[in-house]
Regions:
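HIT superfamily nucleotide-processing domains
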Residues: 1-165
Length: 165
């Protein structure tokens, strides 16, 4: 069992009882997205910097389906606070940049959003960037449906975070 050593310096990486690195250090070794960002999976990173990374969704719901994730482990959208608004905004901007690099200029035919817990398959914050929405199939339209209790747009998430005390 791990003990909490009060004399340990603040720079010590905390390790959970099962030996996993704590998400406090920015990496969860059981998280597939942490592995992708750290280039352990062979997934092509379309963008990667200290703050955010972007790669293609493994099961695309639209001709262009990208995931934008924080480069350090951050829990799902339900765990966010008001201080995460700039991160979410930066994730949306990166999604727009990736779409533009792929010649998607009609931003009226795109969707930016998150699955709301418990309907997210990976509990590392990830923004779905889908385009063109008009070419999404029936199942994808349901899976990424606006005004559903399982999917929230980036704009709705920012409004929700702004309303927190």
């Amino acid at each position: 069992m791990a003990t909490n050593d009060q004399s340990a310096p603040e720079t010590t990486v905390s390790v959970a009882e099962d030996g996993n690195n704590s998400p406090k250090d920015g990496y969860d070794k059981k998280c597939i997205f942490c592995k992708i960002v750290n280039k352990e999976m062979g997934t092509e990173l379309l963008h990667s910097d200290e703050e955010i990374s972007c790669f293609r969704d493994i099961k695309p719901g639209a001709p262009h389906h990208y995931l934008v994730v924080p480069s350090k482990h951050v829990g799902n959208c339900k765990s966010l606070g008001k201080d995460h608004i700039p991160l979410v905004e930066r994730m949306v901007e990166m999604g727009k940049e990736i779409l533009q690099k792929n010649n998607i200029t009609d931003l009226e035919d795109v969707r930016f959003g998150f699955h709301w817990p418990p309907f997210c398959s990976v509990s590392h914050l990830h923004l779905h960037v889908l385009a063109p929405v008009s070419q999404m199939g029936f199942i994808s339209r349901q899976f990424y449906r606006l005004n559903s209790y399982w999917f929230i747009t980036a704009e709705q998430l920012i409004q929700r975070l702004n309303s927190l005390g």
